Design a protein with these regions (language model features):
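Glycine-enriched, solvent-exposed interface loops adjoining structured elements
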Residues: 1-168
Length: 168
């Protein structure tokens, strides 16, 4: 049994279930497996870098963002910006009278990176983060998870069939 492409995965799920009436929903089971993997898996192949210019209090996160590893200002002294909680950043901002300057803290808020203090100039920043697994579909027929861990996709997809088939 080959299990190296999206179509082969869909066929394998149908074969394991011994059902030919689920063809239209098998892609949903695969998507649910990917969602579960994105929530729990942290692998070096998920590590991504993104560069941005931070010149306002808020900077958008990459669309495939899952979790921050590190945020750094890239200049002559490359410095890491400390990750603090949302309450803590509000407290720090109030203590410093909402001043501007070179950011030293950040938090994640509403799909953005909130910097403190608010940048007083345009700073080049580099995000090191965990990104989502590239989703399988008709155009993207394989990815590193399917190539290296096909059992994770197969088992995850089959696991999500149980509620649908009322076998949970």
């Amino acid at each position: 049994m080959a299990l190296t492409t999206y179509d082969e995965l869909k066929t394998s799920v149908a074969d394991f279930l011994n059902r030919d009436d689920l063809t239209s929903v098998i892609p949903d089971f695969i998507t649910l497996a990917e969602t579960s993997l994105n929530r729990t898996l942290r692998h070096w192949r998920m590590e991504k870098r993104a560069n941005a210019v931070a010149d306002t209090q808020y900077t958008a996160l990459p669309s495939d963002y899952l979790e921050m590893i590190r945020l750094s200002i890239i200049d002559s002294t490359t410095s890491t910006i400390e990750n603090v909680g949302q309450f803590e950043i509000s407290k720090l901002r109030a203590q410093n009278n909402n001043t501007t300057g070179k950011p030293v803290n950040f938090t994640i808020l509403d799909g953005s990176i909130e910097l403190n203090p608010t940048p007083d100039a345009a700073y080049d920043v580099q995000l090191l983060y965990y990104g989502k697994i590239p989703p399988l579909n008709a155009q993207t027929t394989s990815n590193w998870v399917l190539e290296n861990y096909p059992d994770a996709y197969l088992y995850g997809s089959l696991l999500h069939t149980a509620p649908y088939l009322q076998e949970d």
